[in-house]
């Protein structure tokens, strides 16, 4: 196991999330400090009158839920869509909630899936992102709803959080809050927590026998369960079950592409948006069974001892799982900006991700091909320019050249740096270095859009978010997750990252309108800003910036250097 691989096993959850999209620069570190205390979930409430009237009670098939009204928005947090997944339910498919008699108090966010929390991160990055880790439990199958009214029939926007398949939650970033979309864009906003890491993607099929056939993908079948809950109940919250859009960023985008290829999700999705993610690493069933066997061996357990595993403390489980994966996986030296190998003929790395089991998941969706099963679902897909922003990385040009040369050779590194400097003469070297991952992400967007187009069915729309934040002297650029503040219309809540400037507010209004229009109609255009579907010959792309515009394949000449 390489030193690089060993080091990666000890990364904080925030570093791991960002390294999945970064160049992997190891240059001079910025001052690091303990992350901010995570007991501030309610600190970002939009100003407005808050009340708990009897009118803020809605029906579900399991019983009534009581929410509150904040600034005119009916808000319900932590509604159960499944039972506790701990103990004997660990690695079993989600079970429907048990009915309740009195109104359920849907007043605070539900628990997150158990996960390794961050301990240290760059102070500046903590400031820009403003994370909230909340609290954790295996009783985490909960969803949140924001709606303008409990009557009517509005488009429904269901958001799946990022963090790969191991970290994150429905409320870890202030951008995830849905009141603004309900208040100003007349949609029903939903967000979801589900099982992650070893709790969501461990193959117990040969350990526990019957009933555990879907264990390796329960993190994904949880999401299907949440979408079924939406179909059965969202009408009681003013939503239209026939206009359900799913969307996600980073790992959430990969969840979206996986769902688009899952037979059990057919008919539950009517639009989809994939943001700075999608496709990616999906191991085979054989690989995941090998990993499970190694975990049992390392723990010193008999091969069929599911009972001990279900009683085991989670941190011990995840430590054993990570150690087993490190033993099985070959060292990865490709550079984080390109991610693990993917595409036809590639060999996936094992870990806590969905598995190609031939039942729940039977294809590498948007990797080998776009799924025929969802060909009639319009897709919106895009990325940001500085996907690789990691504030602790501050290279000189010479250091940057050395790093790139080690990954792609000196000739290509020289050509790439020269092309990026020419294309963006006003950007600092530090900001340009963050943009290499953005070019790689653009390549992936282009490929996924091409696969969708080749189905010759529903359209695909591309975007490229390039708005440069003015905060901290502007060096962070348009970082991984930056667009979320805008497509959720949350520049005020995210003012540490956006400055909530007049330019930011204007852009947010346009982007949130586009996302809401897409949810309603499958077309993100709006008056004065027509968004043309993409085709492989032209790569039509909406560029989101202070001057929003359509361009054919932006950054094409620069990004193609990566493919040469």
Task: Give the role of each language-model region.
Residues 17, 157, 224-227, 231, ...:
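Non-transmembrane alpha-helical segments in soluble domains
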Residues 1-15, 22-23:
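N-terminal secretory signal peptides
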Residues 36, 40-217, 241, 385-387, ...:
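Non-catalytic accessory segments of hydrolases
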Residues 28-32:
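C-terminal segment of classical bacterial N-terminal signal peptides
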Residues 304-306, 457-463, 524-529:
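Acidic/polar loop patches that form or flank catalytic/metal-binding clefts of enzymes
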Residues 532, 537-557:
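C-terminal domain-tail junction helix/linker
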Residues 124-306, 363, 367-392, 457:
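Serine-hydrolase-like catalytic core of hydrolytic proteins
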Residues 280, 316-502, 514:
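Substrate-gating cap/lid region and adjacent catalytic-acid/histidine neighborhood
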């Amino acid at each position: 196991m390489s030193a690089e691989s060993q080091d990666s096993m000890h990364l904080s959850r925030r570093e791991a999330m960002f390294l999945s999209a970064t160049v992997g620069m190891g240059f001079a570190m910025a001052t690091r400090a303990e992350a901010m205390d995570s007991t501030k979930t309610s600190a970002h409430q939009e100003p407005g009158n808050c009340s708990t009237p009897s009118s803020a009670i809605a029906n579900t098939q399991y019983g009534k839920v009581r929410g509150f009204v904040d600034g005119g928005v009916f808000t319900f947090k932590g509604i159960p869509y499944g039972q506790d997944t701990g103990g004997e339910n660990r690695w079993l498919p989600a079970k429907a909630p048990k009915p309740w008699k009195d109104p359920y108090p849907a007043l605070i966010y539900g628990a997150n899936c158990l996960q390794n929390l961050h301990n240290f991160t760059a102070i500046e990055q903590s400031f820009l992102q403003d994370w909230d880790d909340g609290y954790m439990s295996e009783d985490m199958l909960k969803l949140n709803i924001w709606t303008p009214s409990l009557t009517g029939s509005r488009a429904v926007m269901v958001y799946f959080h990022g963090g790969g398949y191991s970290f994150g939650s429905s409320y870890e970033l202030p951008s995830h809050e849905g009141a603004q979309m309900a208040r100003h864009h007349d949609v029903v906003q939903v967000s979801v927590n589900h099982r992650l890491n070893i709790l969501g993607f461990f193959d117990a099929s040969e350990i526990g026998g019957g009933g555990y056939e879907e264990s390796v993908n329960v993190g994904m079948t949880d999401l299907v369960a949440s979408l079924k809950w939406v179909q059965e109940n969202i009408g009681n919250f003013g939503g239209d079950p026939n206009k359900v859009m799913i969307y996600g960023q980073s790992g959430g985008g990969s969840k979206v592409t996986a769902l688009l290829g899952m037979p059990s999700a057919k008919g539950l999705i009517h639009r989809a948006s994939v943001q700075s993610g999608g496709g990616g690493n999906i191991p085979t069933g054989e690989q995941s069974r090998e990993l499970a066997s190694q975990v049992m061996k390392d723990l010193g357990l008999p091969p069929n001892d599911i009972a001990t595993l279900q009683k085991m403390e989670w941190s011990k489980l995840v430590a054993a799982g990570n150690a087993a994966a490190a033993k099985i996986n070959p060292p990865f030296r490709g550079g984080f900006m390109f991610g693990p190998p993917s595409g036809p003929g590639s060999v996936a790395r094992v870990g806590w991700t969905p598995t190609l089991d031939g039942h729940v998941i039977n294809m590498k969706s948007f990797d080998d091909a776009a799924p025929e099963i969802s060909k009639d679902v319009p897709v919106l897909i895009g990325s940001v320019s500085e996907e690789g922003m990691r504030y602790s990385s501050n290279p000189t040009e010479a250091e940057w050249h050395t790093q790139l040369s080690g990954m792609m050779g000196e000739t290509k590194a020289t050509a790439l740096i020269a092309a990026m400097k020419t294309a963006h003469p006003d950007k600092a070297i530090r900001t340009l270095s963050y943009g290499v991952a953005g070019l790689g992400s653009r390549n992936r967007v282009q490929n996924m859009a091409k696969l969708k187009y080749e189905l010759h069915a529903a359209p695909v729309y591309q975007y490229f978010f390039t708005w440069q934040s003015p905060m901290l002297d502007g060096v962070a650029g348009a970082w991984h997750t930056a667009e979320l503040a805008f497509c959720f219309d949350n520049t005020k809540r995210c003012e540490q990252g956006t400055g909530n400037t007049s330019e930011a507010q204007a852009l947010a209004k346009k982007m949130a309108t586009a996302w809401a229009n897409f949810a309603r109609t499958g077309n993100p255009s709006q008056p004065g800003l027509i968004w043309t579907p993409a085709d492989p010959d032209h790569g039509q792309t909406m560029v989101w910036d202070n001057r929003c515009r359509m361009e054919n394949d932006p950054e094409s000449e620069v990004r193609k250097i990566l493919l040469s």
